[in-house]
Regions:
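Short amphipathic alpha-helical elements of helix-turn-helix/winged-helix folds
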Residues: 13-21, 82
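Basic amphipathic alpha-helical segments that dock to polyanions
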Residues: 18, 45-50
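Short helix-capping/hinge SLiMs at alpha-helix to coil transitions
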Residues: 19-23, 69-70
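Key DNA-contact positions within bacterial/archaeal DNA-binding proteins
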Residues: 40
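Beta-hairpin "wing" of winged helix-turn-helix
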Residues: 53-68
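Conserved segment of winged-helix/HTH DNA-binding domains
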Residues: 71-96, 111, 115-116
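C-terminal regulatory/oligomerization modules of transcriptional regulators
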Residues: 96-153
Length: 153
């Protein structure tokens, strides 16, 4: 079971990096260098995020990417939905086959309950909250997100 895929992680790091910059837009090349994300992956991720309306892109000299909405409004679950489709922690071993225990399976009911709690908590995580350090203040290093330092000087 993998809760966060590599593409979701890369997307989250890129969005955090963009959100932490003071400039109007951030180039893909800058993010490749700073975030150490392979160029082909990053380009596809940025295009997808632009297509989904989370990023704005400007082409040409001085172009790049910027947030299309406030970082407080971009949720980790948005990125998970875009890059992972339906996220499911518990998948019954019988899949879609007929299960004699379908209505009475105690383990499934418990895991479903845990899954609901996990997703309730995930829906409360925004890019802005990921960019804060443990005591709720903005990180001193711009673009710090999810244990990755996007900006090293």
């Amino acid at each position: 079971m993998k809760l966060i895929t590599r593409n979701t992680d890369y997307a989250m790091r890129a969005v955090c990096y963009i959100a932490g910059q003071d400039k109007m837009s951030v180039s893909a090349e800058e993010m490749v260098t700073r975030l150490k994300i392979p160029r082909p992956f990053l380009r596809k991720i940025l295009q997808t995020l632009s297509g989904e309306g989370l990023l704005k892109s400007v082409k040409g000299q001085g172009g790049g990417f910027s947030l299309a909405c406030p970082k407080e409004k971009i949720l980790l679950t948005d990125l998970m939905r875009i890059f992972q489709n339906a996220v499911q922690l518990n998948e019954c071993v019988f899949k879609k086959k007929i299960c004699p225990n379908r209505g009475t399976c105690v383990l499934k009911k418990e895991i479903d309950s845990i899954e609901k709690d996990v997703f309730r908590r995930l829906r409360g995580i925004s890019i802005a909250s990921l960019m804060k350090d443990g005591n709720g203040s903005r990180s001193r290093r711009k673009g710090k997100c999810y244990g990755h330092s996007a900006s090293r000087h």
